[in-house]
From Swiss-Prot:
InterPro entries: MEMO1_fam. Pfam families: Memo. This is MEMO1 family protein Igni_0992. Transmembrane segments: none annotated. It comes from Ignicoccus hospitalis (strain KIN4/I / DSM 18386 / JCM 14125). CDD domains: MEMO_like. Signal peptide: none annotated. Belongs to the MEMO1 family.
Length: 285
């Protein structure tokens, strides 16, 4: 079995398991977080198709990410978590799914849903199997400790990174995921990993982020693409978020729910050049 060692343990989050658990709990209880560690529902109560989560170092974006995980905990453990992130390394094809593997973190190993990966490759003409795109990519890896903290080893993952992030590719990917999961009868949730505007002053970033979040909440992928270009908003993972937007619309939803927005300036205190973060729930209608 292919094993993917952690690429950013010790940088984005602690390499020591006890320290990592403490930082996850700090994220939940932080003033910018939900304010408490969630109780995980012992039974599955699916209330969403997925969530948007940030992917910076935990000390910066952990409290915002915690909002999505707090709400997911209330839904109980899904069978499969499809985690989609942007391709920061430039390696691999346009859309890459990780081959069957175990992803190691300081909290243990997370197994891929091998059957779901196989089915996705069978039904999709946009997804290719590739390891190189995933070897050093942090946007998926940083989600795993939160999932492990909540659900232990009861879930499997389908890790996907997008190098091409247009609305049309996002729609094709959404259709492929939905078809593959329905063919297998999977109970699944989609996590869209993305940060928002990068490296501008706090006030400008908040302004730009709100323009993007308005389109995200209104489930308008094409509108999101337009405002990103028009206002030069450096959101790194619009494609993964568009997948959840299209998926929510497929299920008849009209709006997503903004759970929390903040910037790295809110957590670090340095507001001169910040990155924006949001937690968004894509609810079942």
């Amino acid at each position: 079995m292919l094993v993917r060692p952690p690429a950013v343990a010790g940088t984005f989050y602690p390499a020591d398991a006890e320290e990592l658990i403490r930082l996850i709990e700090w994220s939940f209880t932080h003033p910018l977080g939900p304010g408490e560690v969630p109780e995980v529902s012992p039974v599955r109560r699916k209330a969403s198709v997925g969530y948007m989560v940030p992917h910076a170092g935990y000390i910066y974006s952990g409290p915002v990410a915690a909002w999505s995980y707090y709400h997911l905990a209330q839904e109980g453990a899904p069978e499969t978590v499809v985690i989609i992130g942007p391709n920061h390394t430039g390696l691999g094809p346009a859309v890459s799914v990780m081959p069957p593997s175990i992803w190691e973190t300081p909290l243990g190993g997370v197994k891929t849903d091998d059957e779901a990966i196989s089915e996705l490759l069978k039904v999709s003409n946009v997804v290719e199997e590739d390891y190189s795109a995933h070897a050093y990519e942090h946007s998926l890896e940083v989600q795993l400790p939160f999932l492990q903290y909540l659900f232990g080893d009861s879930f499997r993952i389908v890790p996907i990174v997008m190098k091409v992030q247009t609305p049309s590719v996002a729609r094709l990917l959404m259709q492929s995921i939905k078809e593959a999961m329905e063919n297998l009868g999977r109970d699944y949730v989609v996590l869209s990993s993305s940060d928002l505007n990068h490296y501008e002053p706090h006030d400008i970033t908040v302004e730009k982020d709100m323009l993007a979040l308005e389109k995200i909440v209104n489930l308008d992928p094409e509108g999101l693409q337009e405002v990103l270009v028009k206002y030069d908003i450096s959101m790194c993972g619009p494609g993964p978020v568009m997948v959840n937007m299209y998926l929510d619309k497929e299920y008849g939803a009209e709006r997503a729910i903004l759970l929390k927005h903040a910037t790295s300036g809110d957590t670090s205190g340095d507001k001169s050049a910040v990155v924006g973060y949001a937690a968004v729930k894509f609810p079942l209608p």
